[in-house]
């Protein structure tokens, strides 16, 4: 169920219990450095699936962007680039990434031979610095829950959006990994992940960042795994543990064997003996409205905002 958010609680500086130093280090880790190898880098399956579901929501949005930007495309899901190109064939796509080399790798990976049909269905893509008011849609899939400073990231998305442009984003919510958290708690281990922000608080932060008409939605997706090894491999592909009180050092093979044994207790008959993990996925959509001048004895407005207001006034009927 989707609904419009109108809350007044103060936003958080960052997701609860998140270590910003670790999150920032992970976000900017250069492509090609361990554990990233260009020949093997792919987007996590869950990220691709969430991107596919979020793309379907674009059918309910009447605005037709002339340009869009995909933020951190490897984590956002590489398949979405073709889907956005198909939905908005006349629009120019842009790529932005925090990690050095990511945009270049994505562009190289999508080059097809001239005789392959896929070549003719690739969207137009550019990789260049993003100017203020330069794009009509920001696409940010599965990013915010791992942002070291989410309010700064929201502000950056607001900056690059043109007036009446819109933001589409998704991230993980509080019920994510609840089965794994319970297992760790039973063992008196530090938590396996930081606490994820509630969708209502994301709505607050959107308004605080200057967005209008935020609409939030959520769903829970259950993934099952044949073995502890497969479960841990999938989790590693999605990110790292950024909890401030996570294990402080490396652990040996004995602990890993213990972890595997403990994870086997998560197997349930209703999942045919497979290990089940819950992922709460939060979806958000918001517009960038006309800037409003505060009524005061003296008011200030940025030059870029003034230009946009004058441009809108000239084009109004």
Description of each model-found segment:
Residues 10-64:
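Class I SAM-dependent methyltransferase Rossmann-like catalytic core
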Residues 168-230, 237-251:
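Conserved catalytic/acceptor-binding region of the Class I
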Residues 56-59, 63-131, 152:
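Class I SAM-dependent methyltransferase SAM/SAH-binding core
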Residues 136-151:
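A short SAM/SAH-binding and catalytic strip from SAM-dependent methyltransferases
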Residues 99-101, 144, 171-175:
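Short glycine-enriched loops at secondary-structure junctions
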Residues 1-9:
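N-terminal amphipathic/basic-hydrophobic helices that include classical n-h-c signal peptides
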Residues 229-317:
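C-terminal lobe and adjacent flexible extensions of AdoMet/dcAdoMet transferase-like proteins
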Residues 151-163:
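A short glycine-rich, Lys/Arg-flanked "PGG" loop and its adjoining helix->strand segment in the class I
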């Amino acid at each position: 169920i989707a609904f419009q958010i109108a809350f007044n609680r103060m936003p958080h500086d960052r997701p609860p219990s998140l270590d910003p130093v670790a999150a920032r280090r992970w976000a900017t880790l250069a492509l090609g450095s361990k554990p990233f190898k260009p020949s093997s880098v792919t987007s996590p399956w869950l990220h691709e699936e969430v991107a596919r579901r979020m793309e379907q929501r674009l059918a309910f949005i009447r605005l037709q962007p002339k340009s869009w930007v995909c933020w951190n495309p490897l984590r956002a899901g590489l398949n979405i680039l073709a889907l956005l190109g198909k939905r908005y064939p006349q629009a120019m796509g842009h790529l932005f990434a925090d990690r050095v080399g990511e945009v270049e790798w994505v562009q190289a990976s999508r080059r097809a031979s001239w005789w392959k049909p896929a070549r003719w269905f690739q969207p137009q893509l550019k990789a260049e610095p993003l100017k203020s008011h330069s794009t009509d849609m920001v696409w940010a899939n599965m990013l915010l829950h791992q942002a070291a400073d989410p309010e700064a990231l929201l502000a950056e998305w607001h900056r690059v959006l043109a007036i009446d442009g819109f933001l589409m984003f998704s991230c993980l919510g509080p019920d994510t990994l609840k089965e794994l958290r319970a297992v760790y708690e039973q063992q008196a281990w530090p938590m396996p992940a930081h606490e994820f922000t509630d969708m209502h608080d994301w709505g607050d932060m959107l308004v605080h960042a200057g967005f209008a008409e935020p609409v939030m939605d959520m769903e829970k997706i259950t993934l099952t795994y044949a073995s502890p090894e497969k479960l841990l491999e999938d989790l590693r592909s999605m990110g790292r543990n950024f909890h401030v009180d996570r294990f402080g050092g490396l652990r040996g093979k004995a602990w890993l064997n213990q972890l595997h044994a403990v994870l086997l207790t998560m197997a349930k008959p209703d999942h045919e003996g497979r290990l089940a993990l819950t992922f709460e996925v939060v979806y958000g959509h918001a517009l960038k409205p006309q800037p409003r001048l505060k009524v005061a004895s003296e008011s200030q407005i940025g030059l870029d905002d003034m230009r946009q207001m004058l441009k809108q006034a000239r084009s109004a009927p």
